[in-house]
Amino acid sequence: MGKGAGRDKYEPTATSEHGTKKKKAKERDMDELKKEISMDDHKLSLDELHRKYGTDLSRGLTTARAAEILARDGPNTLTPPPTTPEWVKFCRQLFGGFSLLLWIGSLLCFLAYGITSVMEGEPNSDNLYLGVVLAAVVIITGCFSYYQEAKSSKIMESFKNMVPQQALVVRNGEKMSINAEGVVVGDLVEVKGGDRIPADLRIISAHGCKVDNSSLTGESEPQTRSPDFSNENPLETRNIAFFSTNCVEGTAVGIVISTGDRTVMGRIASLASGLEGGKTPIAMEIEHFIHLITGVAVFLGVSFFILSLILEYTWLEAVIFLIGIIVANVPEGLLATVTVCLTLTAKRMARKNCLVKNLEAVGTLGSTSTICSDKTGTLTQNRMTVAHMWFDNQIHEADTTENQSGASFDKSSATWLALSRIAGLCNRAVFQANQENVPILKRAVAGDASESALLKCIELCCGSVKEMRERYPKVVEIPFNSTNKYQLSIHKNANAGESRHLLVMKGAPERILDRCDSILIHGKVQPLDEEIKDAFQNAYLELGGLGERVLGFCHLALPDDQFPEGFQFDTDEVNFPVEKLCFVGLMSMIDPPRAAVPDAVGKCRSAGIKVIMVTGDHPITAKAIAKGVGIISDGNETVEDIAARLNIPVSQVNPRDAKACVVHGSDLKDMTSEQLDDILLHHTEIVFARTSPQQKLIIVEGCQRQGAIVAVTGDGVNDSPALKKADIGVAMGIAGSDVSKQAADMILLDDNFASIVTGVEEGRLIFDNLKKSIAYTLTSNIPEITPFLIFIIANIPLPLGTCTILCIDLGTDMVPAISLAYEQAESDIMKRQPRNPKTDKLVNERLISMAYGQIGMIQALGGFFTYFVIMAENGFLPSGLVGIRLQWDDRWINDVEDSYGQQWTFEQRKIVEFTCHTAFFVSIVVVQWADLIICKTRRNSVFQQGMKNKILIFGLFEETALAAFLSYCPGMDVALRMYPLKPTWWFCAFPYSLLIFLYDEIRKLIIRRNPGGWVERETYY
């Protein structure tokens, strides 16, 4: 419904050959897009770049040359995808699936009305009413569904918002600001902190430039950009900046190497908009159900058509019967019931932070068997936090919990005081203004992720960092850069008995240690010997192995005789020591798991759902988080773990021995789909790290090849192709990019993985409850059809009219059917294996046999019993009714005799007949009471389940009140031909109602006592 309706569906295939060619071409294009990005611009020297693009590296392109290229390549914009026109979407709601069945019913009614009006001149207008009502039902529910989904699917508009509006280019040696659309390949472009990158650039010079690539690669840390070629992979090299990512700080100059759809982001956009999502599982279920119902209807219709010809009815009468039976088989109220049930669940999920954009997704989520989850922000808190420190030669654990309820460490050590001072001073991050009342962890910080983690940690442990910085004013600093890999600052020190200047430094641990010759232990300076270096190395490896980002810290008190007050420090010609410093300690940071995630992953496991982590982050970090949240459970080893334990090379380990598996994106690149299938099949716990957007898509397709129903979570633009392809895409509401929200079917308003599990639970519950609603609704079909069949076979007066059937289907049955959507789960639905879409259908043969063959038959008996009682009370005994139909329905015969010889006029006979219709209708309501109560459960006893569902109790009262109103309201005899009943006639169907209840309770008892037995196999739906 809401998913990727591409252009191909609606274009008439002019010639099948032409159509096939187009399809092949489209498939070729999609395969091309799925391939990894290949380019060599990052490997070229500046001279080669100049030759390739003809750009003067100082003067840029000439205006004339830029105009030529613009004419050749077109503007630097993204092509919007072929969108489905709104009227097509609306028509799909009106004529798709179940609606089609009702339309056919409606047309058949008009046809029957037309035939009778030609034959009789003064036709019965029942068929006309029925046709109009059926059409109205379809139109109303169609509008309702369309309105629900009109809020979705505007993918490219959000891509448009990402296009930078202005770009600063150098042309003819002059800087000029132009519209980003006018940027061409070969242009020389300047960017500064705060700008969006206007196209894919090869950087030729940069000063402290960092870009935020998170929307593209999923890396949360800002990435340094410089002219150096640092990696074969263009996505990871330092000298390429990508279209629509943000420059966070610094400046850079680059040559444009691709524009518009040819950029990396453009390729992802084309990939996302070109993908077609398949049919949702619930749409397939409803299709299966329609086939079943239509099969039953046509079978009955044709059988009785032939039978009526054998019974010597005319051709036309037989056709009218055929139409009547097919229409009577259509459950008019069911379309509305299903739509309302799904909407109610969607509303309930919205209260639990799951916003469903596409109603059918509610059902899909329940049948999910694999969840491919992004790591950053979904499984983790999306904020770097200090996790461990190493000082005084031991590792201390910091508190990473969201509410600061975790571990604490000894803060009295003199070394910790020195370490916290360095972390606070050698740090450019600051809290934004006016946040005194906000909890420290929730405060907004200006600065990069690692520095803000240190800032919050020191603020929590040691009080105000702002005051600390005021006590030690900064004199000079050297910011972090990629060549020396450290950051250094010198501060005034007013503490008595200490030197006047304090030098503090932090950076990559091995680089910091190389600059030190002593170490601070328990506040005492000691020489740095081999033993301490080994201890440092072990701590560094241990913290790095936990997937944490480790920084080293050192300081030096500058001697007053060399550096008196007012000394002019020079950072260009460094005139102060940067060697022989005193090492203080390490601090390591990680983006920690969310508190609710391990529990949610555990729930998924017990529900038989496989959780796979797919992330752009490092394998070590990914594996650490996977272990932390339980995606890799305790005791399960990867191939590398087994190799390390047995001390053998990885190549000698049999991959089948390892339950868990961490796959690197570069390995995935060279895998065939068979190898990927092998991994997905034989490993229960899988982590994919360093993956590209195209690979996410390939992983989703791999899972779907195994027959899994896949849910994918993601927040970046890089996730949108996978979100679109998945059976259900789940985007993040807070951190998610607009694009990912458009591609998804569901949005998590709190970005929390645990909300997906709630969604799965709701989805499973609504699937169970829809079964119950459908079973309840279908049962009354039999007491509605059998009167018509007996009317044909036994030639008796019609026991139940068309108007009364409509009053049941669209009146009394609606609220009770919807109330079953509020029913609680019978058992722990999260302890079940996921539903197998091939075998466990929404409506299966067993449900049909229960509703039609068993409960429905008892209901029909109740109705006929009431009919015969009323006829007998009026003088027509059952034996006298058989074969009376032709006389009874002839308006010119006014002397039909009953069993006692009394004569009845046409008018009097019809009043008795319509009273019977009303009584039959009331009997169906009475037996539907019992049906509603037994449909509450499929296995448990009603006494176990209880009557806690208030809506259902209201439904019982509502249908009874409506039946009484229709029977006793003055004027109903004219409007709907319904007549008042004697109170005793209400009780005729009571025994049958009780029989239904007892029959079903005994059936369920046998199922519970004898699981897997014959009764369960034949009757458990």
From Swiss-Prot:
Chain residues that bind ATP: K485
Phosphoinositide-3 kinase binding, as annotated region: 80-82
Enzyme Commission number(s) from the entry: 7.2.2.13
Pro-sequence residue ranges: 1-5
Membrane spanning stretches: 86-106, 130-150, 287-306, 319-336, 771-790, 801-821, 842-864, 917-936, 950-968, 984-1004
Catalytic reaction list: K(+)(out) + Na(+)(in) + ATP + H2O = K(+)(in) + Na(+)(out) + ADP + phosphate + H(+)
Modification Phosphotyrosine occurs at: Y10
UniProt PTM comment: Phosphorylation on Tyr-10 modulates pumping activity.
GO function term, MF aspect, one: ATP binding
Protein name per Swiss-Prot or TrEMBL: Sodium/potassium-transporting ATPase subunit alpha-1
Organism from which the protein derives: Gallus gallus (Chicken)
Lineage: Eukaryota, Metazoa, Chordata, Craniata, Vertebrata
Chain's gene name: ATP1A1
